[in-house]
């Protein structure tokens, strides 16, 4: 084996061993110490991050494209299934970022969940969640990818429903599973089609063998899978509902694991899509609709976690647009930069919520730049990075995506929606900054504000460095397969920045204006549309089940019971026997003359018959 390949393989196996050791310890009969979460789980992730830097530095210094390590797992007559790990610039760059972000989240969780009696189990779930995502990222075949895919799905169910004493948490966990089941159907159907027509689940072999095949059907299945997992329009309601889970779960779910898995699947499969206009157009339109719709929903939310959740869905829509542009490397760049500031925004939200007696309504916050200056600073940096402020992490990916959209020969509808959504991003980001950090406090004076804890400060500090410099570092080291357009008109170059500034100014004006309310209620229709999340949950969770139940009741009670069973059962027999019974009963009228006449007629007939 080549030394470089040996280095990659041994690093990955060592990383998995370090992460799996704390999990295996939990299966023993020995009770875990109270500090197991910080001494084992957090340390394991930190060590794995440091180990992952070795293959990353080697990869960047040697300029290698990809290394694959395979072990035969199962051999059948038509299909070989291998345990195969792929080291390319997607997995090599993403794994350290995922570990870095998770390390910060786990350290924060030691403070956030310190009073939970089952904190060790919580950390075990988080660690399993991370391992499943790393399996998905490093998989070189669809079967192995599917194991990671299902792993993040089931762990999200357990983590979202962590506080299972609350009905809302159970409902949210069930929603996450059911919506993801729809996506899983797409992935399974796509895998079945590929196994039938290509006879391989190995990613490289699929790319080679499928060149002369029409790949529309399996690609539609993969897009459905990504729609469910990455909460695209139509299968998106589970994502804001998932905020019922603890804040560290939300941070991990939205930054570097669950929701980016769908986009990562499409990035992995992008060579299958690059010549399929149906799939690319569908991704483009679906992403544009998602980013616009969820940004609109975020405008009027008052729950700080739900605003950040909708911003995630909006950014996932932007990544889907990028895949529709046939620029998967830009989508990957946005995944990497987005992980830093999105995790930081959630951790800041968790810090604020804990400091204000579990208050999540931004209207009941304010003035935190005096009381919690570090958290407020990180919240501001994260919101500005999300907006695409120049030279913060989000700028490098977001600006490149909108430039690519501006210079592509695609429909202007997607471009328009994306630019409006970018402006809306600036509006709700500034709204969070304005209501949470600025002005005067609007909460009870007894709130135990305390950010002077290393378990709060250190994770935020690390993620803030990532939010400031992460975009530049990833941008300098990522290999862009396609050369971007190097010349363009100034108005196109400045379009993303212009709409962001416009959004910021609009938000500032609106926030200042609405600090004194002139009307009793806002404009009913647009406000109601945004607050009710576009009426999608009402239609999917209320109208459709109500229609199904009503239809079922009508079929069961009226059509089957009152119509079919009545007409063919008791009533049918009664209707058949009634004429005969009526004719028979008419003959017995109680008149002696009639009876004597009938008797005589019968006697005559019998005599005649016997005589013959």
Swiss-Prot record:
Residues passing through the membrane, by range: 12-32, 48-68, 92-112, 117-137, 142-162, 176-196, 247-267, 279-299, 307-327, 330-350, 376-396, 419-439, 463-483, 494-514, 591-611
- Annotated keywords: Electron transport, Membrane, Mitochondrion, Mitochondrion inner membrane, NAD, Respiratory chain, Translocase, Transmembrane, Transmembrane helix, Transport, Ubiquinone
In which compartments does the protein localize?
Mitochondrion inner membrane
**Looking at the UniProt record for this protein, which Gene Ontology cellular component terms does it annotate, in alphabetical order?**
mitochondrial inner membrane
Q: Which InterPro entries match?
A: NADH_DH_su5_C, NADHpl_OxRdtase_5_subgr, ND/Mrp_TM, NU5C-like, Proton_antipo_N
Provide the reaction this enzyme catalyses: a ubiquinone + NADH + 5 H(+)(in) = a ubiquinol + NAD(+) + 4 H(+)(out)
Membrane topology, as annotated, equals: Multi-pass membrane protein
* Highest taxon above the source species: Eukaryota
Query: What EC number is given for this enzyme?
Result: 7.1.1.2
Q: Which GO terms describe its biological process?
A: ATP synthesis coupled electron transport; electron transport coupled proton transport
Q: Where does the secretion signal sit in this chain?
A: none
> Where is it predominantly found?
mitochondrion
In its keyword annotation, does this UniProt entry include Transmembrane? Answer: yes
**Which Pfam families does the record associate with it?**
NADH5_C, Proton_antipo_M, Proton_antipo_N
Keyword match Signal: no
GO MF: NADH dehydrogenase (ubiquinone) activity
- NCBIfam families recorded for this chain? NDH_I_L
UniProt lists the family membership as follows: Belongs to the complex I subunit 5 family.
Q: What does this protein do?
A: Core subunit of the mitochondrial membrane respiratory chain NADH dehydrogenase (Complex I) that is believed to belong to the minimal assembly required for catalysis. Complex I functions in the transfer of electrons from NADH to the respiratory chain. The immediate electron acceptor for the enzyme is believed to be ubiquinone.
Protein name, per record: NADH-ubiquinone oxidoreductase chain 5
Natural source organism: Gadus morhua (Atlantic cod)
Supply the gene name: MT-ND5
């Amino acid at each position: 084996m080549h030394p470089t390949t040996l280095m990659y393989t041994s690093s990955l196996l060592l990383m998995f061993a370090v992460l799996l050791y704390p999990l295996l310890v939990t299966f023993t009969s020995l009770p875990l110490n109270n500090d197991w979460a910080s001494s084992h789980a957090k340390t394991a992730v930190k060590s794995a991050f440091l180990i992952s830097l070795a293959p990353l530095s080697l990869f960047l210094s040697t300029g290698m494209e990809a290394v694959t390590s395979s072990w035969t797992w199962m051999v059948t007559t038509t299909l070989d299934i291998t345990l195969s790990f792929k080291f390319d610039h997607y997995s090599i760059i993403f794994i350290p970022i995922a570990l870095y972000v998770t390390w910060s989240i786990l350290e924060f969780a030691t403070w956030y969940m310190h009073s939970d009696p089952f904190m060790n189990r919580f950390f075990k779930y988080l660690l399993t969640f991370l391992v499943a995502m790393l399996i998905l990222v490093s998989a070189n075949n669809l079967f192995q990818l599917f194991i990671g895919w299902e792993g993040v799905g089931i762990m999200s169910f357990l983590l979202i429903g962590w506080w299972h004493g609350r009905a809302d948490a159970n409902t949210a966990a069930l929603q996450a599973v059911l919506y993801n089941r729809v996506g899983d159907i797409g992935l399974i159907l796509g895998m079945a089609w590929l196994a039938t027509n290509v006879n391989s689940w190995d990613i490289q072999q699929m790319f080679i063998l499928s060149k002369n095949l029409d790949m529309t059907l399996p690609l539609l299945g993969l897009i459905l899978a990504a729609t469910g997992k990455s909460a695209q329009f139509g299968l998106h309601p589970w994502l804001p509902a998932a905020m019922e889970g603890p804040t560290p779960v939300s941070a991990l779910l939205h930054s570097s694991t669950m929701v980016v898995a769908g986009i990562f699947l499409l990035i992995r499969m992008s060579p299958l899509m690059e010549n399929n206009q149906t799939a690319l157009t569908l991704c483009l339109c679906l992403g544009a609709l998602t980013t616009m719709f969820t940004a609109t929903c975020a405008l009027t939310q008052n729950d700080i976690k739900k605003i950040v959740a909708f911003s995630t869905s909006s950014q996932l829509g932007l990544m889907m647009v990028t895949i529709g542009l046939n620029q998967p490397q830009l989508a990957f760049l946005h995944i990497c930069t987005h992980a830093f500031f999105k995790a930081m925004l959630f951790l800041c939200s968790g810090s604020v919520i804990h400091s204000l007696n579990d208050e999540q309504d931004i209207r009941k916050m304010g003035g935190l730049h005096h009381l919690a200056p570090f958290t407020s600073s990180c919240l501001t940096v994260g919101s500005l990075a999300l907006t695409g402020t120049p030279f913060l992490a989000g700028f490098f990916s977001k600006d490149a995506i909108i430039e690519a959209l501006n210079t592509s020969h695609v429909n202007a509808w997607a471009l328009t929606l994306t630019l409006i959504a970018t402006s809306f991003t600036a509006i709700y980001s500034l709204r969070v900054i304005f209501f949470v950090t600025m002005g005067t406090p609007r909460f009870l004076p007894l709130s135990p504000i305390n950010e002077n804890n290393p378990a709060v400060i250190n994770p935020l500090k690390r993620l803030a460095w990532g939010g400031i410099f992460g975009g530049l570092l990833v941008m300098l080291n990522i290999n862009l397969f396609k050369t971007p357009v190097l010349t363009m008109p100034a108005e196109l170059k400045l379009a993303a920045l212009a709409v962001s500034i416009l959004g910021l100014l609009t938000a500032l004006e609106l926030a200042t204006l609405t600090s004194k309310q002139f009307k009793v209620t806002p404009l009913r229709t647009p406000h109601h549309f945004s607050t009710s999340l576009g009426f999608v949950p009402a239609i999917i969770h209320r109208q459709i089940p109500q229609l199904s139940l009503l239809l079922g009741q009508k079929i069961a009670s009226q059509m089957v019971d009152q119509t079919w069973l009545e007409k063919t059962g008791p009533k049918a027999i009664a209707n058949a026997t009634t004429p005969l019974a009526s004719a028979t009963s008419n003959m017995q009228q109680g008149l002696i003359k009639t009876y004597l006449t009938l008797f005589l007629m019968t006697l005559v007939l019998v005599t005649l018959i016997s005589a013959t």
